[in-house]
């Protein structure tokens, strides 16, 4: 588990957590609250994105929409639908503390790259809510849920190399299929599976050690 994400996943699988259904319901309420806030911040871009979630769209229109999406890497856009997102991006400087009082890392870094715009809002809401969880075991399980769903929904190959771009009708359809996935709802479904397996009801931790080290160390 030399990679930190692998360390988190190993911790979650081996040690589980004690996360009651009531605690989980409160967690999802926090997630929804954060998601609603983020939706308000980029409502125009989200409305525009949703118009592409239908059958038989002109792939060139979606290609242009994606290419004109601003990020910290390409902060300028002349698309009026991106005005709100461009404003957010202007407040984020890589390597510096965020100047905004709400979570928007994925929204300002990876919108219409590795994930759709709505998906980035969902991921930021989830990650921010997870960070507020005090118990480390529970946090590890929730992070594992999020990473699992992100891996399935990402607009990329399975090893998260370069993100996929709209180049044809087929690549457009492939991307839109992935970007229609609601990350929050998929996380809820996966949590149900984890709970069924007993991963969320370990009242006494067996505590297997994970070291975040290379095997040679």
Where are each of the predicted segments found?
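Conserved SAM-binding loop of SAM-dependent methyltransferases across substrates and taxa
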Residues: 2
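Adenosine-cofactor binding site in Rossmann-like domains, unifying the SAM/SAH pocket
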Residues: 199-217
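Class I S-adenosyl-L-methionine-dependent methyltransferase module
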Residues: 5-196
């Amino acid at each position: 588990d030399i990679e930190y994400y692998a360390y988190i996943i190993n911790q979650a699988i081996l040690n589980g957590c004690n996360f009651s259904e009531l605690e989980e319901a409160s967690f999802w309420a926090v997630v929804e609250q954060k998601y609603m806030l983020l939706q308000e911040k980029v409502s125009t871009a989200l409305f525009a994105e949703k118009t592409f979630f239908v059958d038989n769209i002109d792939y060139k229109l979606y290609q242009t929409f994606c290419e004109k999406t601003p990020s910290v890497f390409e902060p300028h856009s002349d698309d009026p639908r991106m005005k709100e997102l461009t404003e957010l991006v202007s407040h984020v400087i890589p390597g510096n503390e965020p100047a905004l009082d709400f979570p928007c890392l994925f929204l300002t870094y990876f919108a219409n790259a590795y994930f759709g715009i709505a998906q980035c809002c969902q991921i930021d809401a989830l990650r921010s809510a997870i960070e507020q969880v005090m118990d480390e075991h529970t946090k590890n399980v929730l992070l594992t849920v999020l990473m699992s769903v992100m891996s399935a929904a990402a607009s990329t190959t399975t090893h998260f190399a370069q993100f996929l771009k709209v180049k044809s009708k087929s690549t457009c359809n492939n991307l839109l299929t992935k970007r229609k996935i609601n990350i929050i709802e998929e996380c809820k479904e996966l949590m149900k599976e984890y709970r069924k397996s007993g991963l969320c009801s370990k009242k006494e931790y067996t505590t297997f050690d994970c070291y975040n080290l290379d095997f040679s160390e």
